[in-house]
């Protein structure tokens, strides 16, 4: 039977029009200043769509525009150029690969639709696509390469010669590491290659022998922590994408490793050392002498816990720590003691996070190949070792129409278009090792996701912490994943399923049925009529097509932190996070900023049917008080709609439980996991953190990290004032600062994001 090709319909752009002609354009000057008021970045006469904010344009120009080798101007000067080079590269690669489009006309229609989506800020690819894609095609950019890519003619993985002809486009990598010097330092090399081109990577280091075990020559092993310190220093020396952000990495250790207690305490202990040095007069900057002196500051740390361990904690039973090579029990300690060390460290410095091993592998589509051991730096991508995932995120707010209704049809079209583009990127891209390249080609995992959920809910007048809010989140996530997997099955019909599908077909179809059964958890009655039936029919199609054709991609969706690309899309909130504050700072043309009320507040008041004069009075009150509590004309029953992740003392704030419940509403419909910070007040106790971790486990969340207000003492920090020693823990109070421009950062979705220059730390 002749294979089919994908149909690419016109939707946003019709009648032979160019997508650029559907936008009004403007020219602005970009200027970013550091905390001293000095110009940090400057570019004159930058062209962008009229609807883009000054901040979004600043992000595009400073982070994503090509800065060298562009004919005539020397650097890119327009959002039009940036989007054009990326889209042309993707479509040209699709034509070379074959099987995606029946004709050049179909390919041209797809290119127009994708351009419109990107220019209208309905969606965006992960940062490495903007950094690297299209630079060879548009500007003949060259850089020596030690990467590997799929060769369509030779039907095998081949070494590449030019880093930009087959660019690195995936943000997320998971790499294996074995118990040998060669493997450990091979990892150091591949990590450096990934960081250089703007990606992040994670590894599970549990195979490495502990300091309590012998080497092959009869001596004692150096131990896990000693090697982690070496790799940490390497990451600290590299900025991803040249100058865009620091290296992002994840370190995972299993709960039965003999050095797990040292690992749990590692970052906390090192930060205490740094603070003693700072108190003695050394610089508090992240790149200052104090933080350069200590280790453990350049990664997110997570402990991999099993159901057996969690039950041992509940039942107050002992826990066994086992030798890596022999499996011999080296030590037996109360499970509760290990657990208390985890919650204590998280209380003091927000690390380590927790990954729930059995929950993760319960939803694994390819267990016949191997189990899932680790994740990327922000914990949203969880798949096989030595694999990669390119991300794209949809801006949910862009699908609210003038009446406040959600445009499901255009959302579906956007999700499908982005997903096809992501699939094309798999074999367009290169990878740091031959094994990662082979697994990427053979399994083709993708990470479609969304941003701005918190803003969407507020604008609709729906409380984040409500059954209706969780119903919206679950419905939109199930719809997005259903579209992605249905599209994947259509691509499998056209080009064949992923190479590892046959071995894993039963397991993958089982997981698809689990996703479908989870639809029964959504409170559909709280949503617009007909959505329930439409989503259920969609998933019937996913199962029918999957059984008939298989799937082109082993994974389809994640919820990423959308750190920098969230700013590019003018998102008020990232990932599934709630709004951070009712007050925002708006950047002005030519520099500077003004304080404004979050735009979602007025939209919410309109959705709740407040009159114009009532809305204006409430907005004025919010501007002066950063709260709706006590505002004139405010109805008490509407107050939960305006609850945020943080608040001034005594004001309304979302509970930590509400964060976990939102994660649980979304998790059953995601291939991977969710990058999310559970915000907790400064008054939270270790017992409170323990309760949140247990709640996440019991609700089926795959991974969780907490942030107790004022606790974080790693990453880019600066003293806000003369240190006040906290008597109980012996460390000073600090305020987060951007390592690039020095502005205050915001912790969101597990990442520190600078709203001034767009720098992110820990995000990919």
UniProtKB/Swiss-Prot annotation:
Active-site feature positions: 376, 378, 380
Matching InterPro entries: RdRp_reductase_class-2, RNR_2_N, RNR_lg_C, RNR_NrdJ/NrdZ
MF terms (GO), sorted A to Z: cobalamin binding; cobalt ion binding; nucleotide binding; ribonucleoside-diphosphate reductase activity, thioredoxin disulfide as acceptor
Catalytic reactions on record: a 2'-deoxyribonucleoside 5'-diphosphate + [thioredoxin]-disulfide + H2O = a ribonucleoside 5'-diphosphate + [thioredoxin]-dithiol
Any Pfam family hit: Ribonuc_red_lgC
Residue positions binding substrate: 127, 171-172, 200, 376-380, 561-565
Keyword NADP attributed: no
Residues spanning the signal sequence: none
Cofactor note (record): 5'-deoxyadenosylcobalamine (coenzyme B12).
EC number: 1.17.4.1
SUPFAM superfamilies, sorted: PFL-like glycyl radical enzymes (SSF51998)
Keyword annotations of the record: Cobalamin, Cobalt, Disulfide bond, DNA synthesis, Nucleotide-binding, Oxidoreductase
CDD domains given in the database record: RNR_II_dimer
Disulfide cross-links: 172-389
Known function: Catalyzes the reduction of ribonucleotides to deoxyribonucleotides. May function to provide a pool of deoxyribonucleotide precursors for DNA repair during oxygen limitation and/or for immediate growth after restoration of oxygen.
Assigned protein family: Belongs to the ribonucleoside diphosphate reductase class-2 family.
PANTHER family: RIBONUCLEOSIDE-DIPHOSPHATE REDUCTASE, VITAMIN B12-DEPENDENT RIBONUCLEOTIDE REDUCTASE
UniProt protein name: Vitamin B12-dependent ribonucleotide reductase
Native source organism of the sequence: Bdellovibrio bacteriovorus (strain ATCC 15356 / DSM 50701 / NCIMB 9529 / HD100)
Gene assigned in the entry: nrdJ
């Amino acid at each position: 039977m002749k294979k089919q090709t994908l149909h690419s319909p016109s939707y946003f752009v019709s009648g032979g029009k160019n997508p650029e002609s559907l936008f009004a354009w403007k020219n602005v000057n970009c200027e970013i200043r550091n905390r001293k008021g000095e110009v940090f970045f400057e570019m004159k006469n930058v062209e962008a769509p009229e609807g883009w904010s000054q901040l979004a344009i600043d992000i595009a120009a400073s982070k994503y525009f090509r800065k060298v080798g562009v004919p005539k101007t020397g650097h890119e000067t327009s959002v039009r150029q940036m989007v054009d080079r990326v889209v042309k590269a993707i479509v040209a690669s699709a034509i070379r690969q074959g099987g995606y489009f029946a004709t050049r006309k179909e390919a041209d229609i797809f290119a127009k639709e994708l351009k419109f989506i990107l220019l209208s800020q309905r969606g965006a690819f992960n940062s490495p696509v903007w950094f690297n894609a299209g630079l060879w095609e548009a500007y003949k950019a060259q850089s020596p390469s030690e990467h590997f890519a799929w060769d369509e003619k030779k039907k095998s993985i081949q070494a590449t010669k030019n880093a930009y002809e087959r660019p690195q486009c995936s943000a997320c990598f998971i790499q294996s590491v074995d118990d040998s010097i060669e493997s450990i330092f091979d990892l150091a090399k591949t990590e450096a290659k990934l960081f250089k081109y703007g990606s992040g990577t994670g590894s599970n280091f549990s195979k490495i022998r502990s300091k309590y075990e012998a080497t092959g020559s009869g001596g004692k092993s150096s131990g896990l922590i000693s090697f982690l310190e070496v790799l940490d220093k390497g990451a600290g020396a590299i900025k991803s994408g040249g100058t865009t952000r620091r290296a992002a990495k994840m370190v995972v250790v299993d709960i039965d490793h003999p050095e797990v207690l040292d690992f749990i305490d590692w970052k906390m202990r090192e930060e205490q050392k740094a603070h003693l040095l700072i108190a003695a007069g050394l610089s508090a900057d992240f790149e200052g002498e104090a933080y350069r002196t200590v280790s453990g500051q350049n990664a997110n740390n997570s402990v991999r816990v099993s159901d057996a361990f969690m039950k041992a904690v509940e039942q107050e039973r002992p826990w066994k720590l086992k030798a890596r090579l022999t499996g011999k029990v080296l030590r037996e300690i109360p499970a509760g003691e290990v657990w208390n060390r985890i919650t204590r460290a998280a209380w003091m410095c927000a690390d380590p996070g927790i990954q729930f091993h059995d929950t993760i592998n319960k939803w694994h589509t390819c267990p016949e190949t191997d189990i899932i051991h680790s994740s990327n730096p922000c914990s949203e991508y969880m798949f096989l070792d030595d694999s990669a995932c390119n991300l794209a995120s949809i801006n949910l707010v862009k699908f609210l129409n003038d009446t406040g209704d959600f445009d499901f049809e255009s959302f579906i079209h956007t999700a499908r278009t982005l997903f096809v583009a992501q699939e094309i990127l798999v074999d367009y891209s290169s990878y740091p090792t031959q094994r990662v390249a082979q697994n990427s080609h053979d399994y083709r995992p993708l990470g479609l996701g969304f941003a701005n959920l918190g803003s969407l809910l507020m604008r609709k007048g729906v409380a984040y912490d409500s059954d209706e809010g969780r119903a919206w989140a679950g419905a939109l996530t199930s719809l997005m994943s259903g579209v992605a997997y249905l599209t994947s099955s259509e691509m499998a019909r056209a080009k064949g399923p992923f190479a590892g599908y046959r071995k894993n077909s039963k397991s993958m179809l089982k997981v698809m049925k689990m996703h479908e059964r989870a639809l029964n958890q959504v409170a559909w009655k709280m949503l617009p009529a007909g959505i329930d039936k439409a989503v259920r029919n969609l998933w019937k199609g996913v199962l029918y097509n999957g059984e008939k054709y298989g799937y082109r991609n082993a994974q389809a969706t994640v919820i990423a932190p959308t750190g920098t690309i969230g700013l590019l899309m003018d998102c008020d909130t990232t990932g599934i996070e709630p709004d951070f504050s009712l007050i925002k700072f708006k950047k002005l043309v030519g520099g500077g900023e003004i304080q404004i009320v979050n735009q979602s507040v007025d939209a919410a008041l309109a959705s709740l049917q407040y009159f114009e004069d009532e809305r204006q009075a409430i907005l004025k009150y919010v501007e002066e008080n950063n709260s709706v509590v006590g505002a004139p004309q405010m109805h008490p029953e509407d107050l939960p709609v305006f609850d945020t992740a943080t608040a001034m003392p005594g004001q309304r704030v979302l509970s930590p439980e509400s964060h976990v419940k939102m994660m649980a509403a979304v998790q059953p419909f995601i291939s991977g996991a969710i990058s999310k910070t559970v915000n907790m007040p400064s008054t939270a106790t270790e017992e409170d953190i323990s309760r949140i971790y247990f709640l996440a486990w019991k609700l089926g969340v795959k991974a969780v990290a907490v942030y107790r207000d004022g606790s974080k003492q790693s990453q880019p920090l600066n003293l806000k004032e003369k240190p006040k020693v906290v008597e109980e823990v012996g460390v000073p109070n600090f305020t987060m600062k951007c390592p690039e421009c020095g502005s205050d950062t915001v912790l969101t979705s597990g990442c520190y994001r600078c709203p001034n220059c767009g720098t992110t730390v820990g995000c990919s």
